[in-house]
Amino acid sequence: MKSYSITDVGQIRSMNEDVVFASDIPVGNLPNLFVVADGMGGHKAGDFASKFALEVLLENIRGNREFNPVKIIRNAIEDANSRILKEAADHECMSGMGTTIVLATIVGHYAYVANVGDSRLYLIHNQDITQITKDHSLVEEMVRIGEISRDDARNHPDKNIITRALGAVKDVEVDFFDIRLVPGDILLLCSDGLTNMVSDDKIRDAILTGETLEDAGKS
């Protein structure tokens, strides 16, 4: 297994509120771990939220003696959500902060995936790209009920309104997915900073034409 991670502020925002974590080696009882979180909130609150969520997540996973990957991930995400809510309640400047999160761990032939918000995980398999996670966003709901098309969603004025996030409510709802992998499969975790700007087909092409994962990430 090979992995590569990169984050960039881009040309739109003045501050990068994304954090990434990639470990090919065990984290607690998980054999590996890959995380992307995209913070939100005024001033530096969004930047803090994503970093704090990752910090709590890793702390929880490393201290968990459970062996079931879904239980480990669920417990860690719920802990991060509770801690973000407490920080926001204790510090007025952090009020309203939150973060998306998408993470994956590969156990044997399976990838176990969780997400909250609109950060995504894609599977690239046999030249095809498939979005595994479902966005928790207003425009995704509009697409689901047929109000707008998938293409319209990318440029919709409300594309940044999300319906779930860590730090939004006490009882966070987490989506879980499991994927059977075969040799040659590629997983991509990313925030909306990529998917708002680049189509799925162009993402796939960049990954498949890169000689290495680093080439693909930097393209």
Where in this protein do the model-derived segments appear?
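PP2C/PPM-type serine/threonine phosphatase catalytic domain
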Residues: 1-219
